[in-house]
């Protein structure tokens, strides 16, 4: 079985992330969306909230499941016996950063490859940071994120903003 891991903070998950999952789910038998718990980053959504939002946003993808982890990605990949890391690319800037990360991961875990998937052109400008900023300033992010995420952002803005 070909198992791949799509790691990220996903704060929040965007339509760009879902696009990458839809593409990669056609290639791998199973994909784990590995939500990173990074104590050095201040997240808008809690780890549990991010996991739930991704689960709800990927219900249509039968071979995708969601998990949370902290620590070194290499250790997580070895534990899950993954064969690949999934990464999405929007622009050349993404490629440069992701290539460095792929090389580092290859050094740490030589038997695992990084697979790059190009974002659909309609998603190249979407980032979680931009979505959060737009939502915080009252922008309509409905075309940028799954409906459940839009609702979650609106709730956050009402309760926290």
Swiss-Prot record:
Its cofactor is Mg(2+). Pathway: Cofactor biosynthesis; coenzyme A biosynthesis; CoA from (R)-pantothenate: step 4/5. It is found in: Cytoplasm. The record marks 17 as: Transition state stabilizer. InterPro entries: Cyt_trans-like, PPAT, Rossmann-like_a/b/a_fold. One of its GO terms (biological process) is coenzyme A biosynthetic process. Coiled coil: none annotated. The keyword Manganese does not apply. It catalyses: (R)-4'-phosphopantetheine + ATP + H(+) = 3'-dephospho-CoA + diphosphate. Its main location: cytoplasm. Signal peptide: none annotated. Keywords: ATP-binding, Coenzyme A biosynthesis, Cytoplasm, Magnesium, Nucleotide-binding, Nucleotidyltransferase, Transferase. GO terms for molecular function: ATP binding; pantetheine-phosphate adenylyltransferase activity. GO terms for cellular component: cytoplasm. The keyword Cytoplasm applies. ATP binds at residues 9-10, 17, 88-90, 98, 123-129. Its EC number is 2.7.7.3. Pfam families: CTP_transf_like. Substrate binds at residues 9, 41, 73, 87. PANTHER family: PHOSPHOPANTETHEINE ADENYLYLTRANSFERASE. Belongs to the bacterial CoaD family. Homohexamer. This is Phosphopantetheine adenylyltransferase. It comes from Syntrophomonas wolfei subsp. wolfei (strain DSM 2245B / Goettingen). The gene is coaD.
């Amino acid at each position: 079985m070909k198992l791949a891991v799509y790691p990220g903070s996903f704060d929040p998950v965007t339509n760009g992330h879902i696009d990458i999952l839809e593409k990669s789910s056609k290639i791998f038998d199973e994909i784990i969306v590995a939500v990173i718990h990074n104590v050095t980053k201040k997240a808008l959504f809690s780890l549990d909230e991010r996991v739930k939002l991704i689960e709800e946003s990927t219900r249509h993808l039968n071979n995708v499941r969601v998990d949370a982890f902290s620590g070194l990605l290499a250790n997580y990949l070895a534990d899950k016996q993954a064969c690949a890391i999934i990464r999405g690319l929007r622009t050349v800037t993404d490629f440069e950063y992701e290539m460095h990360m792929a090389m580092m991961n290859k050094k740490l875990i030589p038997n695992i490859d990084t697979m790059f998937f190009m974002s659909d052109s309609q998603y190249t400008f979407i980032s979680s940071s931009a979505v959060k900023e737009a939502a915080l300033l009252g922008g309509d992010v409905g075309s940028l994120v799954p409906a459940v995420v839009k609702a979650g952002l609106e709730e956050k803005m009402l309760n926290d903003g």
